Amino acid sequence: MVGFCPHCGSLMRPRESICSACGRNINDDPLDDNIAPIMPKNLTDPKTVEQEDPDLPFFPYEPRPVQVSIIRDIVEAFDNGKHIVVESGTGTGKTIVSLAAALDHASRNHKKVVYLTRTISQSDQVMKELRAISKLRPVCGITITGRGRSCPYLRTLSGYEDMHPSVLASLCEEGKKKYNDGQGGCRYYGGSMGRLKDTEAYVKASHPTSEELDRFCEDRGICPYEVRKMIMKDMDVVVAPYVHFLSDDIRDGFLGNLESDGTDIVMIIDEAHNMIDAAREQESFTIPMTLVEGALDESTTMRGDPPLFENVTLRPFLNELKNSIRSFANDHLSLNEKESILGPTELEDRIMKRFELSKRELDIAIRTLISLGEERTDMLMEKGENRISDLYTLGDLLKDWMLSASDRYIKSINVNDKEESLHAACIDPCDVTRFVREIPGVLHMSGTLQPLDQYVKVMGLSKDCYQRIYPSPFPKENRSVIYLGNVTTRYEDMKRDPSIFSRMEKNIARLCNNVDKNTLVFFPSYSMMNKMMPFLERDVHKDLYWEVSGQQKRTMKALYDFRKGRNGVFFTVMGGSIAEGIDFPGEELCFAIIVGIPYPPPTLESKAMSKLFDEKYGPGTGWRYTSEVPALRKMQQAIGRLIRTETDRGMAVIFDSRASKYATRLGAILSNDPLQDVTNFFSKTQ
């Protein structure tokens, strides 16, 4: 269903080209080839201890009181075989406290720690902390990556980036078979067999990041992908992307390599607020018209017209599917509509009526289509085309479409500028997360996870799971958040009073011009940012930098230049990689302006989820879970960029009167004179 971003390793929606985690196009060259990373300045590692504390055996630093509490609570939950859901503020050391607690429990119970991350890049911090822990106790870990990212043999093949994972697996197996048969094949696989012990010794001694391990292996003619599979069972900690437990097939292979049935592990889910969406995305999929047309083109190259079931042959079946998609678009969508709900079995009913098939007979026809696609794929591979047959891909998706007729999914017909498509969106991920729920001991941790009860309910966790909130230990006086009571981005208000827009723009410009600090301005959407851009470029007299939608390389270059300076303004949107995934320590960021409350625009999926939550948890719950909670998380993430160390000082101004409703959660107070309040804050001695 899904793939991985080649740049950050994140889970991606089917057939998307822009990664929602890092924002980069999957076809871009690696940015690191062009722009050197900025290293945080004036940062010191926590002070390490000379010898272990018997009460905190895997904690290598002098602990803050809150860290002791977190570790004890996690250990207690794990010892009782429970899940624990935690929101942990900046400065609590989420990575190290979770590792220390998990290793404490695992070492006493002969278990392994599985650490799930949203992106591969987040695994680097895990390896750094394992290095620190290893100075107290022997401990080792490894980061698992996909074949497409870490296999050097495949990277020698032209166009490997666009190949289907099944093709990559087939080519990999072919390379190994040829090597074992003495016919050449993959020399990296051969190198892995002869230098396995050396590689394992390096991993246990050096705790390499994913990139460091790849480089070590390739320099020695070893396959990093194969080595990871071979030695992961001997590691104390195994780090992997979410998909390794959301995908049944990948999970089975992962646990097989770990030699585990899932009962002998404890799990840490990092940035857990992303887990539910990742689970939904794992089960959601699209059937585009181009795929149907590709399958039709393939069918014309086949001898005759193969039967799918009795008198139903391939080409009429594919033509009926094409006509059905077209008819759905014409019948369900008005001139300006882009999407419309389909009935749970509307497509199946139409095809069954056309060919006089029962549901069982339609199932047989689709299985036959898949078999034809498998034969076609084998032929393509033998010819060296290295791709999956469109017939196979279409058949596999139709099988999933038939299986997604429950109320856990919403089906729709979509039309964009290019083509029509069918889409099945998972709105209830409880089946996908079942395996995770059954593990006896899982930590769900994030800096922005409130309300915890929402996460517990939607994930389907037991009511007796532990729920904890730990505030940041950093000085409260180092951060200030204010909001304005006379502006809002609410559509109805801005339409009724157009002067709101100009008032916001002038006040944003006024604050930017009078604060001699690096400033981030967060907008609720690209459309509002682009609408205000010409006025801000006219009125703000500083170096200005902009996030550009769909152009991550350009955006990251602008961000790089912004972080090098100390008096620029960077304009971005809430909820993107800059708002969540990048730290700005010290003077890299001191001031943030948040324009509006970023309620997500209503979609078919969000409306269906809202209805589902209202039915399951009570009236009003749906809007809260699908609109209010995501908006607040985005705002908290934006504000959280300000304070990354205990000496950072920062201030945020929210341009929306509706923030009064969330003032307690955001730690915000009403301001009648924002410029004076900002001036007073930054005039205080640090």
Language-model features and meaning:
Residues 40-58, 62, 109-238, 246, ...:
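A substrate-engagement module of RecA-like helicase motors
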Residues 73-76, 95-109, 128-132:
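Walker A/P-loop NTP-binding motif
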Residues 80-98:
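Walker A/P-loop
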Residues 98, 104, 121-124, 128, ...:
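Signature of the SF2 helicase/ATPase Hel1-core->accessory helical subdomain module
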Residues 211-235, 246-257, 365-488, 495-499, ...:
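A contiguous, basic/glycine-rich beta-loop/short-helix subdomain that forms a polymer-engagement track
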Residues 485-499, 549-658:
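Conserved RecA-like P-loop NTPase helicase motor core
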Residues 489-524:
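Conserved interdomain hinge at the start of the Helicase C-terminal
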